[in-house]
């Protein structure tokens, strides 16, 4: 059922070391404020912190009470306050207001600010402007890599996507470079590096500088990971905009997986309580169904339930000695498996109910038509009806973006019509969202004679490579065209199927979208790894209108074992989806690779749209 790893599959590195490092550094920072202290934690950091150091660990290091950072006066009576926050201006203003309030009240306390994952000069400037710089000590907790699973690392920076791809803010590039530097320090150098996208190139260049400055740290080390591939999210928006149909992706779309765990409500747990469940390889039931197409999952869970019942029924014919062994060795494991099985069956039933209500089949049919370029008028009518029925503003926006990207922009008549209908249906406050989507290249209007010539492509790429900021704005309209149809043809993203696609025995990565579409990002990775370079992909790179790079260090490659050369680290800048992860796991099984994923955050179509929206729900 699940994709069993090939017997010759390489072993994954042990990433638990990253957790220990992060925990030790945090404890060191907390101990710099000796004695009892209250800890104020920003909401964004609560889940990642829980995976690194739980409440009991914090208590051991004299953290008395925990508070959530909220825009209201602090109720703490402690003489020492510690703040664990993201490096944001609003957080610094909030901390400064608390310090100034204490000053006015004549109260003397000690204050420590721990900024994660990085300390920015602008943050200290705010403290200076507010007149509290001398009262507060500022430190950095360089916690930028959280292992969510054996093969998945997350930087837990969902804001990266909007900051970079909409605002052009490059501050997180240093964080990415530092994270890659940490990985190469711990797990040896990467002999082969590939990448595509402007952000990927900048991250790579900065990382190489860090490597050169501290070359002695990795000198002589045997590489544990043979290849690294950096990829910008805007190289492939289409995959991220599609509805997910693998089990883990559907759970994320339906319940929102946050920091590797999910809150299952009463409709799943069949009780009056919600339950927080960690979803990773340790959950034996989940690990067998996570990468499966949803249509296969119910059958598997039913069979699993029957097998479990048969194991319970074995008790009936046992004598006392056998019963004793059964209770001490097997019963606990069976009960745990039974609990997990009940949860996943409940989750499947809940997903089925929601999807039936939404007419999921019709939605998928429309998406497939958009991907294939068929019945565009019919698909446009479906989107109009979606807007008219006021289904979900996010869902309607997603479909409009998918139509725009697959069609290389909307014809002016359709763009104006859909935009007007949307604003009338959901409210004029969404107007700024349309501006954001246009700037990011997600929802654009075709101009007369709108085609991208080879010359324009080269000029745009040259500017993108050589300069940042304002110069690229002049070329943004060139750089944002998708050319999806041409790329799709070149890379055979829409498989030709003779007869019905067998989702039980998938033949290629397209199974993650019911056999209709191979994720563009995954196909690019596959093609480059097959060639060990970008050779022969010049036309694809031109159509993508991105800068690509490849670098091989033969001296390091010679030191690498054949096993490590089959380990590939894929870095998604701007987020990756569970569908892409499942597709690459499948590719790994087929080709004898093991993929490791590093992402700025796990994303899906709803998160992508919410990041662009100016209307916060």
UniProtKB/Swiss-Prot annotation:
| Matching InterPro entries | Sec-1-like_dom1, Sec-1-like_dom3a, Sec1-like, Sec1-like_dom2, Sec1-like_sf, VPS33_dom3b
N-acetylalanine PTM positions = 2
Report the PANTHER family cross-referenced here.
VESICLE PROTEIN SORTING-ASSOCIATED
On assembly, the entry states: Interacts with RAB11A and VIPAS39. Associates with adapter protein complex 3 (AP-3), clathrin:AP-3 and clathrin:HGS complexes.
Q: Which family does it belong to?
A: Belongs to the STXBP/unc-18/SEC1 family.
* Function in brief: May play a role in vesicle-mediated protein trafficking to lysosomal compartments and in membrane docking/fusion reactions of late endosomes/lysosomes. Required for proper trafficking and targeting of the collagen-modifying enzyme lysyl hydroxylase 3 (LH3) to intracellular collagen. Mediates phagolysosomal fusion in macrophages. Proposed to be involved in endosomal maturation implicating in part VIPAS39. In epithelial cells, the VPS33B:VIPAS39 complex may play a role in the apical RAB11A-dependentrecycling pathway and in the maintenance of the apical-basolateral polarity.
- What is this protein's record name? Vacuolar protein sorting-associated protein 33B
Organism of derivation: Mus musculus
